[in-house]
Regions:
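Membrane-embedded segments
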Residues: 51-140
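C-terminal regions of proteins
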Residues: 244-313
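Short hydrophobic beta-strand that contains or immediately precedes a catalytic carboxylate
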Residues: 44-48, 281
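Active-site segments of SGNH/GDSL-like serine hydrolases
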Residues: 216-242
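Alpha-helical transmembrane signal-anchor/signal-peptide segments
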Residues: 26-44
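Secreted/periplasmic serine-hydrolase-like ester/acetyl group-modifying domain
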Residues: 111-217, 221, 225, 310-313
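Hydrophobic membrane-insertion alpha-helices, especially the h-region
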Residues: 6-24
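Acidic-and-aromatic substrate-binding clefts and catalytic sites of carbohydrate-active enzymes
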Residues: 72-75, 205-211, 237-245
Length: 313
């Protein structure tokens, strides 16, 4: 019996070593063959979740590239940004979205819930280092194992055929508008479910230490590579439920990020039609905000605290 168990252990250990070996080798080859250079050669980079994804229309802002993506925790933002920042020396300033919902405990859900993990591992697994993969495996082993087996199967096929023509979707500006009548009922149902979750989460006052850890890693990485970091909070309507953690949000910012410039646009003057909900801008709102932000960049005052700037559209 002992001999049998020993053989099982040796087999599993060998399998794990083989899988990690294939993962490491294929990841290195993919990174080597992938082109992370941004065609526009931007001076400014925007990172974050759905709020900046909907707010920064980079076609209206000279020298800026928006790589924000909805539902993205700082964990994935950090790993996907490393090669982009390394390979684009023209980037001088990185604007990172930092708002009330970024500190919420539910942002852990954005990292290792299977819906988010599976989708992002399939795109970014070659960018995530062993430390990050072990963390994902620890928090959701079934999803991690299933997804990585799928990824490695694809990778093995690519290794055998020498096919490394990868094109990675890293995020970007997303055009938004009011809901059309034929999708409004479905979207309203989903919105109501999310509102219940967000309402509970915003009132719990618990924070995501995990998400904040990777925000700090991202900041330190940018500094190490000579990039200025500016935190940005985007427009939010007064009815937005995450205003309830404003005290905690302010405390965390002052305790951990007080040395960084903070552009606070939370109360930026916009009309109701400039929003698609309480925290995301419509196409019209994004155009208004982006035009203002583009002018701000030209004044070179974006390194200042937003309290010293004029909030005129």
């Amino acid at each position: 019996m002992r001999t049998f168990l020993k053989k099982i252990f040796v087999f599993l250990l060998s399998l794990i070593i083989l899988l990690f070996g294939v993962d490491w080798l294929s990841s290195e080859l993919i990174i080597e063959k992938s082109d992370f250079k941004l065609i526009s050669k931007p001076k400014y980079l925007v990172l974050g979740h759905s709020q900046p994804e909907h707010a920064f229309n980079d076609s209206l802002i000279e020298g800026l590239k928006n790589l924000a993506e909805g539902g993205e925790s700082y964990f994935y933002t950090y790993y996907k940004s490393v090669e982009v920042i390394k390979k684009n020396p023209t980037i001088e300033t990185v604007f990172i979205n930092f708002s009330n919902n970024n500190i919420a405990k539910s942002r852990d859900f954005w990292t290792w819930d299977c819906y988010y993990m599976a989708e992002r591992l399939k795109r970014f697994s070659h960018l995530i280092q062993i430390e990050g993969k072990l963390k994902l495996a620890y928090h959701n082993l079934p999803c991690f194992t299933e997804t990585m087996l799928f990824v490695l199967q694809e990778r093995l096929s690519d290794l055998l055929t020498q096919n490394f023509g990868y094109s990675i979707n890293l995020g970007g500006y997303k055009i938004s508008s009011k809901l059309s009548s034929n999708t409004e009922q479905l979207e309203t149902s989903l919105s109501n479910r999310l509102r219940v979750l967000n309402s509970f989460d915003s009132k719990s006052k618990k924070t995501s230490k995990h998400n904040l850890k990777y925000l700090n890693k991202l900041i330190e990485f940018c500094k190490k590579h000579g990039k200025q970091v500016v935190l940005v909070r985007l427009p939010q309507q007064q009815e937005y439920n995450f205003w309830e953690n404003e005290i905690e949000f302010s405390q965390i910012r002052k305790q951990y990020f007080t040395e960084l410039p903070f552009l606070d646009f939370a109360k930026f003057p916009l009309e109701d039609e400039d929003f698609i909900d309480h925290s995301h801008l419509s196409y019209q709102g994004a155009c208004r905000f982006s035009n203002y932000f583009g002018k701000l960049l030209k004044t070179k005052k974006y390194h200042l605290n937003q309290k010293s700037l004029d909030h005129k559209k």
